[in-house]
């Protein structure tokens, strides 16, 4: 039996595949390549992530997040497909959600009405969420980020390699993380799932 067969994923491998979690872009970050996150390159140039490494990083990220007070964690995204996953994650985990525009000074200017003091920042895309990343770095706040194959890694303390652009991918990633954080905190049993399926974390398409 191969090591790949023996490894027990957080969700069935087919779920990762059908959600497109491992699909990257045609651009590649050498930093990610050197760390073995990028598994292969398709004939059309699309980079493919190593699903096992995604799974391993999700486990570690959940342990890391579970050590913080929920209300001292800010999860931010400016990507519309990330709005619902982030809001659902924060609903279950108890942390703060900031979707849409990040007002400059939110983490650095105490005179702003929306000034927020946090101990951990979690962003969906460091490229799009660059303002939040820059402010957290300036304040010495640890940063967790979902990173695609073309994502800059500067200032990121912990990276979760994955497709951070797809609607279904983001839903599954945040569903897994929410479940794992609650398991780590003892609020769910080790084999217990969330009361809603990953589809409930998906941003709905307007017909």
From Swiss-Prot:
GO terms for molecular function: structural constituent of ribosome. Keywords: Ribonucleoprotein, Ribosomal protein. SUPFAM superfamilies: Ribosomal protein S2. This is Small ribosomal subunit protein uS2. It holds the Pfam family Ribosomal_S2. It comes from the Archaea. The gene is rps2. Belongs to the universal ribosomal protein uS2 family. GO terms for biological process: translation. It comes from Pyrobaculum islandicum (strain DSM 4184 / JCM 9189 / GEO3). The keyword Chloroplast does not apply. GO terms for cellular component: small ribosomal subunit. The keyword Ribosomal protein applies.
């Amino acid at each position: 039996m191969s090591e790949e067969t023996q490894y027990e994923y957080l969700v069935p491998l087919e779920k990762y595949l059908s959600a497109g979690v491992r699909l990257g872009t045609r651009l590649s970050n050498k930093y990610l390549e050197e760390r073995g996150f990028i598994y292969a390159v398709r004939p059309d140039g699309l980079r493919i992530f190593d699903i096992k490494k995604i799974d391993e990083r999700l486990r570690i990220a959940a342990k890391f997040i579970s050590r913080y007070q929920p209300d001292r964690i800010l999860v931010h995204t400016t990507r519309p497909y990330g709005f619902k996953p982030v809001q659902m994650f924060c609903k279950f985990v108890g942390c703060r959600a900031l979707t849409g525009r990040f007002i400059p000074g939110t983490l650095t200017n105490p005179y702003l009405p929306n000034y927020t003091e946090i101990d951990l920042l979690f962003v969906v895309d460091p490229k799009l969420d660059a303002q939040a990343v820059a402010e957290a770095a300036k304040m010495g706040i640890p940063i967790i980020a979902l990173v695609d194959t073309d994502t800059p890694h500067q200032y990121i303390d912990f990276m979760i390699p994955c497709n951070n652009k797809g609607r279904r991918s983001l839903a599954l990633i945040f569903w897994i993380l929410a479940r794992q954080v609650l398991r780590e905190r003892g609020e769910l049993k080790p084999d217990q799932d969330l009361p809603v399926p990953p589809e409930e974390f998906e941003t709905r398409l307007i017909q």
